[in-house]
Design a protein with these regions (language model features):
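Cysteine-rich micro-motifs
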Residues: 219-226
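Short helix-coil boundary/hinge micro-motifs
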Residues: 1-215
Length: 226
């Protein structure tokens, strides 16, 4: 059971049926031809998706023990990000769907507000780096919580940017009040923010297995093995 009473143990994700990955040229802005090529994962049909209920604890267990390919192994990192997208879906598709539904509802109440092409545009996909960054941050957070001296051998700049990334994920968590039910809940923009909130809220349950050294969430305070 989560320590934070507002915390959820699962997260609703949305999965498309097929995904593809490729190099795309991203312009800095619409008024300039300057940009760079980025490896992006896209859905074959982004307008068709299925909601799935993801267990946060089992997802965190998997990602915390995922072996990340080296930075120089671009193909390995691309394949891992594609594999994770196929299994869990896009990180920020829920936020896109929420924004789209909000625009539709707003349009129903404000007839003067037209539905623009930007509002109706399907989700354009995500860079490979987004999943890789999440896995890196999860593993850093686990070690930072479980190993007291973990950051002593790290450069201060490295610690700063990892801590900053954790905070960026947590900044995507917002309290929401339901006036009809008179209840308050924590709403996460993405599975990334839901995962990070779960990690920091359950840090006292985090243990290191005495046999394989893998980190796991203990059901009992005296648990020693995963």
């Amino acid at each position: 059971m989560a320590e934070n009473s507002l915390l959820e143990d699962s997260f609703i994700q949305y999965k498309c049926s097929e995904y593809t990955v490729g190099e795309y040229y991203n312009k800095i802005n619409a008024h300039s031809d300057i940009g760079r090529y980025t490896t992006i994962i896209k859905a074959i049909n982004p307008n068709i998706y299925t909601p799935i209920n993801i267990s946060l604890e089992s997802t965190i267990q998997r990602l915390s023990n995922e072996k990340l390919p080296k930075i120089s192994d671009k193909e390995g990192r691309t394949n891992l990000a594609l594999q994770l997208t196929k299994h869990y879906g896009f990180l920020y598709l829920p936020k896109h769907i929420e924004s789209f539904n909000h625009d539709i509802e707003l349009n129903q109440h404000v007839s003067l507000l037209p539905l623009t092409e930007e509002m109706l545009r399907p989700y354009e996909g995500e860079s490979v780096g987004q999943w890789i960054k999440l896995v890196e941050t999860i593993q850093y957070a686990f070690n930072r919580i479980n190993i007291p001296d973990f950051t002593k051998s790290m450069r201060s700049a490295e610690v700063f940017f990892h801590d900053e990334q954790i905070q960026l994920y947590l900044n995507e968590v917002n309290p929401v009040y339901d006036f009809d039910k008179e209840t308050i809940s924590l709403k996460c923009d993405s599975i990334a923010s839901a995962i990070m909130l779960y990690i920091v809220s359950n840090k006292r349950r985090l243990k290191s297995c005495e046999v394989c050294s893998k980190l796991f969430y203990a059901k009992r305070s005296n648990a020693q093995y995963c």
